[in-house]
From Swiss-Prot, chains A, B:
InterPro entries: Alpha/beta_knot_MTases, tRNA_m1G_MTases_N, tRNA_mtfrase_aTrm56. This is tRNA (cytidine(56)-2'-O)-methyltransferase. GO terms for biological process: tRNA nucleoside ribose methylation. Gene3D superfamilies: 3.40.1280.10. GO terms for cellular component: cytoplasm. Its EC number is 2.1.1.206. It comes from the Archaea. One of its GO terms (molecular function) is tRNA (cytidine(56)-2'-O)-methyltransferase activity. SUPFAM superfamilies: alpha/beta knot. It is found in: Cytoplasm. PANTHER family: TRNA (CYTIDINE(56)-2'-O)-METHYLTRANSFERASE.
Length: 218, 218
């Protein structure tokens, strides 16, 4: 199965953060490609930065200024996430049988054509909430939760799950039993570092922070 | 089980949209209360507006300027969502046994105290993505997916899930078999209305749009 996420209707002047979250969710929840429309190099750059630091999970990061054409020429199944669609649980088993899936995530008003072009208009509940959440739940259902355990290729840092505080190791120093040699941030440390699972934590890491830096940046 | 979501570190000048998404996810994914810190009346107002239009799902919408005190005086279990925490799948069964759960969602850097105060630091995968997605997945795991089927109390509008386009009915006109009398938006309509499952769709509806308006606003 190959899954691409197409974010349409992105407004560079006001959607940067939400769209970045959409892209990061695509990456972290098992999509193979992320395509942004219209193009916004800053968002793509942020995603590439995350891939460089945390490892490669996406095969392609791209953009298009012809999103309708992109959808029309997609040689696979088209899924459009919308609160007006059919319950995800009623269609996910069928969708999971497909080879190539394009998941459309709208930003501003979604033109009528997308509803028509989509093979599946899928709702994650029928209440208004967030396209970020909708994409995460859709992919989580699609992969049955297995997406959370994918291991990235390369990159510089890995997190060792811990009860309190932060354990971050450099790639290559994880050690056979899960990080002993590379662990410099002691357990229970906490600190002011980027603990929140949000896009913002990425922002502070452009200078190639090691695990030591993670708790010390302000 | 009673679940509250506490959003901490909100920056009114730049987090309004993300925090609104967090609040809407809390509402749509089964939380009973949403507490914002620090206070930002505009975000709370938006949530109240959604509750008024789409029906009541939250029992409490509140804010606090003493978040640490709020956590310290919480007489229940404290969960902190962080990419450095333990895998959600390894702790969710235990958490599900608790009576009262406070879910902390950070925005900017999360102070060390929260890691210490939390009974569970929980990671939705150990990759950076989005606090909006993290909260959605956590609540989805907590409720085993049942949260998507909760019915709100009152409100003005209900969506009837549909294959293409939009079906929206006024509350009270749903009809016994699912909306026949109230359905004015015909199937296959699509249109430029707010189809995306995002907070933005809420914005255009302040004037009390009926289903007719839903597809016509620009």
């Amino acid at each position: 199965m190959k899954v691409y996420v197409l974010r349409i209707g992105h407004r560079p002047d006001r959607d940067k953060r939400i769209t970045t979250h959409v892209g990061l969710v695509a990456r972290a929840f098992g999509a193979h490609g992320f395509v942004l429309s219209p193009c916004d190099e800053k968002v793509l750059e942020k995603l590439r930065d995350v891939e460089e630091r945390w490892g490669r999970l996406l095969e392609e990061i791209a953009c298009t200024n012809s999103p309708l054409k992109y959808v029309k020429t997609w040689d696979g199944t088209v899924v459009h996430l919308t609160m007006y669609g059919l319950p995800v649980d009623s269609v996910i088993d069928e969708i999971r049988q497909k080879d190539k899936i394009l998941v459309i995530v709208g930003a501003e008003k979604v033109p009528r054509e997308y509803y028509e072009l989509a093979h599946y208009n899928v709702a994650i509940g029928n209440q208004p909430h967030s396209e970020v959440a909708a994409l995460a739940i859709f992919l989580d259902r699609l992969y049955g939760g297995a997406e959370l355990y994918r291991q990235p290729v390369g990159g510089k840092l890995r997190i060792i799950p811990t009860e309190k505080g932060k354990k971050v190791v450099k790639v290559g120093e994880e050690g056979p039993s899960g990080g002993a040699p590379g662990v410099r941030a002691e357990r229970g440390r906490g600190g002011r570092g980027e603990g929140v699972q949000g896009a913002d934590e990425v922002r502070g890491h452009k200078r190639g922070a090691t695990d030591r830096d993670l708790g010390d940046e302000t």
